[in-house]
């Protein structure tokens, strides 16, 4: 509960409407807040099956440039990595997206820094991670490749050169407000191949604005995720015994501003 309260304080900073910007301005600000039953990232639970409160703030320009920040409570720093204190993830990212010709293709390139403030013994590898990415989208489909440029990758040392490839689809069901999704990804850890795994997900999300204007910006969803990760390498340390790559079903509610 303490971790959730801390996350609520932080994400509450972005849970207010952005400053007024003229409708025809090239500058756009947006924010979002999410409550989820489990924070699952690329198939791996970041909260050990516990709930998370998350929030983000984004700026975009008509040219295609964007930047933003996002935060969530996490549990794996203490329960898996060996941190003596640490229960937050804070991300900062920037990139550029745009159209390719008239074929309906959309590209997105950028970089993201994952930061995990906290205390850890000197023999524990820091969790902070630097990633660059490139994505190509067409209609309902997206292919995204992420490459890690930091020496440490989510707590694994000497792992620069690790990468993650994902293929996903997001299909709206007519004008119902329902969107069905599916994805598959594969994570390869340089010099840490025992940690390699594939993950997959199926999901459904519903735009509550279809129910009434009072719910504009609210989305509810459910997702099922699973991996082929080795439990010997992805299970929390004693006294916790949660396999972080286990199959799980999550539900969430998001409010966008």
What does each model-found stretch correspond to?
Residues 1-28:
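Cleavable N-terminal export/targeting peptides
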Residues 21-28, 64-67, 99-106, 171-180, ...:
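Short loop/turn motifs that connect adjacent beta-strands in outer-membrane beta-barrel proteins
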Residues 23-75:
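Short glycine/proline- and aromatic-enriched beta-strand/turn motifs that initiate or cap beta-hairpins
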Residues 27, 49-53, 86-90, 105, ...:
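Residues that define the transmembrane beta-barrel architecture of outer-membrane proteins
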Residues 31-33, 57, 67-69, 94, ...:
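Membrane-embedded beta-strand positions of outer-membrane beta-barrel proteins
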Residues 35-41, 61, 71-75, 98, ...:
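Transmembrane beta-strands of outer-membrane beta-barrel pores
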Residues 45, 62-126:
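Surface-exposed loop and membrane-interface regions of Gram-negative outer-membrane beta-barrel proteins
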Residues 202, 206-208, 241-257:
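Outer-membrane beta-barrel "beta-signal"
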């Amino acid at each position: 509960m303490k971790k959730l309260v801390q996350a609520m304080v932080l994400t509450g900073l972005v849970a207010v409407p952005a400053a007024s910007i003229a409708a025809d301005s090239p500058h756009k600000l947006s924010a979002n807040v999410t409550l989820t039953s489990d924070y699952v990232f690329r198939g791996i639970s970041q909260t050990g099956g516990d709930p998370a409160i998350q929030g983000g703030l984004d700026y975009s320009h008509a040219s295609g440039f964007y930047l933003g920040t996002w935060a969530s409570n996490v549990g794996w720093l203490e329960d898996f990595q060996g941190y003596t204190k640490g229960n937050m993830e804070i991300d900062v990212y920037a990139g550029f997206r745009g159209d390719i010709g008239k074929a309906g293709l959309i590209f997105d390139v950028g970089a993201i820094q994952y930061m995990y403030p906290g205390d850890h013994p000197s023999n524990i590898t820091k969790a902070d991670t630097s990633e660059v990415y490139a994505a190509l989208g067409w209609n309902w489909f997206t292919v995204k490749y992420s490459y890690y440029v930091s020496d440490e990758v989510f707590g694994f040392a000497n792992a620069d050169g690790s990468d993650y490839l994902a293929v996903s689809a997001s299909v709206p069901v007519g004008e119902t407000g329902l969107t069905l999704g599916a994805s598959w990804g594969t994570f390869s850890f340089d010099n840490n191949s025992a940690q390699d795994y594939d993950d997959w997900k199926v999901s459904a999300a519903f735009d509550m604005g279809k129910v009434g204007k009072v719910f504009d910006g609210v989305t509810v969803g459910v997702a099922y995720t699973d991996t082929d990760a080795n439990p010997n390498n992805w299970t929390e340390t004693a006294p916790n015994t949660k396999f972080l790559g286990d199959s799980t079903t999550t539900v969430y509610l998001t409010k966008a501003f």
